[in-house]
UniProtKB/Swiss-Prot annotation:
Residues covered by region (Disordered): 1-134, 481-535, 586-612, 712-733
Gene from which this protein is expressed: Fgd3
ZnF segments: FYVE-type: 528-584
Sites bearing Phosphothreonine, chain numbering: T732
Biological process according to GO: filopodium assembly
Key words, A-Z: Cytoplasm, Cytoskeleton, Guanine-nucleotide releasing factor, Metal-binding, Phosphoprotein, Repeat, Zinc, Zinc-finger
DH domain segment(s): 153-337
PH domain residues: 366-465, 612-711
Origin: domain of life: Eukaryota
Comp. bias regions, Acidic residues: 118-129
Taxonomic source organism: Mus musculus
Compartment annotation: Cytoplasm; Cytoplasm, Cytoskeleton
Protein name per its UniProtKB record: FYVE, RhoGEF and PH domain-containing protein 3
Length: 733
């Protein structure tokens, strides 16, 4: 059975192809998209019904031809046409296969789902007439390459972008509103569905409510007067960084799907029931989950082709180049997440082989090389099987375990890279040998071939040299930090001279003057008694990479990352996050209250969110402005354009994950008579949330952070960024 056809399954419950994001097709930004058909034969049916009967260019291809899907790079029924042929591409003339911007066509036979009824069903050819405003360009038109101008080429690329975006939004809808919703309704635990689908809901809302409507309006309505794509992509490209979280979780999600399919009959029944529906296109859940992983590179390829055909003096040139930079950054962000997960997977595999003998699963560790090797006995020259694991900071010398299950290797020697030396030797009775010398032991090893020996020697030498360079850099950095380290005493406390502690000129038993030595000793004793970790993040201090600082308002010891807030524009005014949010942004005078009194008079700070966040804390949430519930709000660093609202505390379940792009922030009207003070409204489409902070200062901090995130600029405040306006005749709290 070809992927372009699907069998009928009337006994299965039909699933709506698109969810209802608003009250109707006209009230939702996806109104036009909701009118589009879904399914492998839907587009062909509509196309054939509207085409003339004698037009051979619109006929379906033979059953042996595969349907290319430019969105995912593999053959699937998501393509709206049976065969695409771009006349403006250099390879279109005389080519038996469609030219799709150089993307290879792959098969998806492994992802097919067997149907109960193997009989193929012919397309009926009956369907709704397509909307002329959203009718895509049909590349089957017989236009030669010489007749296709540059503006037409750009229009073809823009229409291809719109076409693939519409198909992609349907896939996202299928994942979020069909698979995830049905599994939740079937009673699958929330942590399982969250682990499988990650932040797919935020990705779906971004594309369905913002990117797709912008592209539809520009390409179908405004292209004749404003033929541009760069301004839209430049505005929305920063939000593509949210794909990093999905990509990083992808392997774990695949494992959860496989595990729950095998162990839970209910989970398996729900998945198989959906996969048999026409809306699923005869493809598995795993196939659809791969779409977001491949989407950002597709944008990059399309935009590169767009820039290649865009004239140098075009008005859209600058915006398009900037958009390509932002999309490439988002792609690099996803690739970095993939590489990080692959590195951790390698460490986990080694950890399992060693039976947990060595704690090597650490983001700072990196596996450089591993392999089996022979060890030469110093007594009789016999060889013994051994295994080497070379990391960036240590080498593990292991022996095989003689057991069928469980641990495969045991660590015989752990050799630090800083003390490691490698030497090539030539022995008449043993070829391909070299010696590794450590602090406690020397090993004479033998490889199978001379090339393998040279490779081990080169890799070990390069690893040792790189480790030495890093150590020298850390030592230099540590010396610079020691010179620039700030005093640990608060500026409010007077610095006592040594003469006030002991009379000047009083000698110790050895005849020396103990003034300076006494102060050094007391400073060291005080530091030893302090907590070893930061008050805010809890990370342990060290003398090189994690220096300690003291908050100038509350006096608590904090790290450099948690003391980036300043009460005034000077280095001597570092304060912690809690004091920065609650205290006036002016340094305390010597005659004011002591730091202890300031800490007692200040309101209770919010507990620290264990996840890295741009801003987090406790807020009150209401859906109607009358009933309020306490929630934990956070703007995560990994997804800075999303506001997460959790029930109760940071350990509670996720209530809302609100994409901040396109949101509006307003102040409530006094006539509403809200019970909670320091409140504001957050609008997204037709939905409104009422939020309230404990104090006016915290309210201003939240408004500033939300206003920055709404404009997609989390690196800093943009000049001229709009702030929420209060209703006329009222004062902003």
């Amino acid at each position: 059975m070809e992927l372009g056809r699907s069998s009928s399954t009337p006994q299965e419950e039909a699933i709506s192809p698109l969810g209802v994001l608003g009250t109707g097709p006209s009230s939702s930004p996806l109104g036009k998209l909701q009118a589009l058909p879904i399914g492998p034969g839907a587009h062909r049916g509509a196309h054939s019904s509207s085409a003339p009967a004698g037009d051979s260019s619109t006929r379906e291809p033979s059953g042996a031809m595969k349907i290319p899907n430019r969105d995912s790079g593999i053959d699937s029924p998501s393509s709206s046409v049976a065969s695409e042929n771009f006349p403006c591409e250099e390879s279109s003339e005389g080519s038996p296969s469609p030219a799709i911007l150089g993307l290879p066509s792959e098969t998806a036979s492994d992802s097919r789902v067997p149907q109960d009824n193997p009989q193929e069903e012919e397309d009926s050819g009956v369907g709704e007439e397509p909307d002329p405003k959203v009718t895509l360009f049909r590349p089957q038109e017989d236009v030669s390459l010489t007749q296709c101008s540059d503006p037409q080429k750009l229009l073809h690329i823009a229409q291809e972008l719109l076409h693939t975006e519409e198909a992609y939004v349907k896939r996202l809808h299928l994942l979020d509103q069909v698979f995830c919703t049905k599994l939740t309704e079937a009673g699958i635990p929330l942590e399982v569905t969250t682990g499988i689908f990650s932040n797919i809901s935020s990705i779906y809302r971004f594309h369905g409510q913002f990117l797709l409507p912008e592209l539809q309006k520009r390409i179908t309505e405004e292209w004749d007067t404003n033929p541009r794509l760069g301004d839209i992509l430049q505005k929305l490209a920063p939000f593509l960084k949210m794909y990093g979280e999905y990509v990083k979780n992808f392997d774990r999600a695949m494992g959860l799907v496989s595990t729950w399919t095998q162990r839970s009959p209910q989970f398996k029944d729900v998945i198989h029931t959906i996969q048999k529906q026409e809306v699923c296109g005869n493809l598995t859940l795993q196939h659809h989950m791969l779409e977001p992983v491949q989407r950002v590179p597709r944008y990059e390829l399309l935009l590169k082709d767009y820039l290649k055909r865009l004239p140098r003096d075009a008005p859209d040139r600058k915006d398009a180049e900037r958009s390509l930079e932002l999309i490439s950054t988002a792609a690099d962000h996803s690739n970095a997440a993939i590489r990080k997960m692959e590195k951790m997977h390698k460490l986990l595999e080694v950890y399992e082989q060693l039976g947990g003998e060595e704690d090597i699963v650490n983001p700072a560790n990196e596996l450089i090389k591993e392999g089996s090797i022979q060890k030469l006995s110093a007594k009789n020259g016999t060889t013994q099987d051994r295994h080497l694991f070379l990391f960036n900071n240590v080498m593990l010398y292991c022996v095989p375990k003689l057991r069928l299950m469980g641990q495969k290797l045991s660590v015989r020697e752990k050799m630090d890279i800083s003390d490691l030396q490698v030497q090539d030797i030539v022995k008449p009775n043993a070829a391909c040998t070299f010696i590794i010398t450590g602090r406690k032991r020397s090993l004479e090893l033998q490889t199978r071939t001379e090339e393998e020996k040279k490779e081990w020697i080169q890799v070990i030498q390069a690893t040792v040299e790189k480790h030495k360079q890093k150590s020298e850099t850390f030592r230099a950095f540590g010396g610079a930090c020691s010179q620039d380290e700030e005093p640990t005493l608060s500026p409010d406390q007077p610095v006592m001279s040594t003469s006030s502690v002991e009379p000047a000129g009083v000698a110790d038993s050895n005849g020396g003057t103990p003034g300076i030595e006494s102060r050094k000793s007391s400073s060291k004793t005080r530091r030893d008694k302090e907590k070893p970790g930061c008050k805010s993040c809890g990370e342990t201090f060290n003398s090189i990479t994690k220096r300690r600082y003291r908050c100038k308002l509350c006096g608590e010891v904090i790290c450099r990352k948690c003391s980036e807030f300043k009460a005034e524009n000077s280095k001597q005014s570092r304060v912690c996050r809690e004091c920065f949010l609650e205290e006036p942004l002016v340094p305390p005078s010597p005659s004011s209250e002591t730091p202890t009194e300031l800490k007692q008079n200040a309101e209770k700070p919010p507990s620290v969110d264990p996840r890295p966040s741009l801003l987090c804390g406790t807020l009150n949430l209401s859906d109607d402005g009358t009933t309020w519930n306490e929630v934990w709000a956070a703007i995560p660093e990994s997804d800075p354009q999303v506001l997460d609202l959790l029930a109760g505390s940071q350990a509670g379940r996720l209530l809302y994950s609100i994409p901040l792009s396109g949101c509006n922030i307003t102040m409530p009207d006094p006539e509403e008579g809200l019970e909670a003070g320091c409140a504001w409204k957050l609008h997204q489409g037709s939905q409104t949330w009422w939020l309230s902070a404990p104090s006016t200062k915290l309210q201003q901090c939240w408004l500033k952070a939300l206003g920055t995130a709404v404009h997609g600029d989390t690196a800093g405040d943009r000049p001229g960024a709009s702030q929420p306006q209060a209703p006329a005749g009222t004062d902003t709290p």
